[in-house]
Amino acid sequence: MASIEAVHAREILDSRGNPTVEVEVALDDGTIARAAVPSGASTGQFEAVELRDGGDRYGGKGVEKAVAAVNEEISEQIVGYEAEEQRLVDSALITLDGTPDKSRLGANAILGVSLAVAKAAAESADLPLFRYLGGPNAHVLPVPMMNILNGGAHADTNVDIQEFMIAPIGAESFREALRWGAEVYHSLKAVLKAHGLATGVGDEGGFAPNLDSNRAALDLISEAITKAGFTLGQDIALALDVAATEFYADGAYQFEGSSRSAEEMAAYYTELVESYPLVSIEDPLSEEDWAGWKALTESLGDRLQLVGDDLFVTNPERLQRGIDEGAANSLLVKVNQIGTLSETLDAVSLAQRNRYTAMISHRSGETEDTTIADIAVATNSGQIKTGAPARSERVAKYNQLLRIEEELDDAAVYAGANAFPRFARQG
């Protein structure tokens, strides 16, 4: 067993040009591993706190305080721990911080250390990270939920819904699914050009045109799927991240130019489900609208996946409330929302034990770190959301999944339509 010999953090840049934390952990057997922390654009108010410096430097977004926390206080605390004792390390980090939201040391400091320790332990054990975390049964390759058209907080456009995604549910392998997604992505670019629309991209690599409505986005993507030679609803399905908290105020939703109630939003989603092969809608309602979530789950929860992101913030306590109240039926998993690997895995386990699906997710501010790809396979979650098949910080995760599928060889199983048990394939 190798123990932690040194911990070092530095400030690096993420995909939006903002600072983030990277941590290196060295073990006494010579192993060195590093992890970099992502950052979100649309963030839930119940997320663990990202420590930023304030002031003029980097527009107040510097992370020198978080870096100092790692290099001083955290390093002093965890040097000497066995790297394979992940839960002990994470527990020590949580105790050292001493706040319920990790606001003293910063979730960005704590998470960087937590992930780097796991990666070092895996390397020391001569195991790929997915195998180290998931054991011998880790074998399911996730459906890539590709955000190919951006709106909301991820793009400077007049489209309310934040993400329009494609899900290659009919592919036979992850490799094939990735190809299908890339082909539709390029088809969509051609479709947008043919309609005289802009083909600039948003934070996550998806196109970000100004459109007349949210339905127009779904129509364009449907056209792109068909023109790429695929069957809509059988080969490739659709999914949304509404990020409704972003346009919720004073008990109402400011959507498509009007103020709407939760009931009116539910009626709108029902119309969409009737019109398009939607397998998943993420954050259809606000993180504070528990009554609306419960009613929506009762009306649509047997037809598609209703994913809690801002609602749950990868927090087992909030997820348990959702389970108890019948709100949502799926968990979005973002490691930096909760701040340690152990708590992340606990949230996934709680979801799966209660027949909630789990979708492993990136953030809009990403790095070349590929840890979430391994987590997706380790947990057999069957779904990953990590952007369009463009921009290297997104593609890095997809390429890592290609490597994992190749390593698993005949043991690899692509989740495909089985990832969405509530959806009846069309076509």
Swiss-Prot record:
Lineage of the species this protein comes from: Bacteria, Bacillati, Actinomycetota, Actinomycetes, Streptosporangiales
Keywords: Cytoplasm, Glycolysis, Lyase, Magnesium, Metal-binding, Secreted
Origin species: Thermobifida fusca (strain YX)
Stored SUPFAM superfamilies: Enolase C-terminal domain-like, Enolase N-terminal domain-like
Cofactor(s) named in the record: Mg(2+)
Family assignment from sequence similarity: Belongs to the enolase family.
GO molecular function terms noted in the UniProt entry: magnesium ion binding; phosphopyruvate hydratase activity
InterPro entries reported for this sequence: Enolase, Enolase-like_C_sf, Enolase-like_N, Enolase_C, Enolase_CS, Enolase_N
A GO cellular-component term linked to this record: phosphopyruvate hydratase complex
EC number: 4.2.1.11
Protein name (database record): Enolase
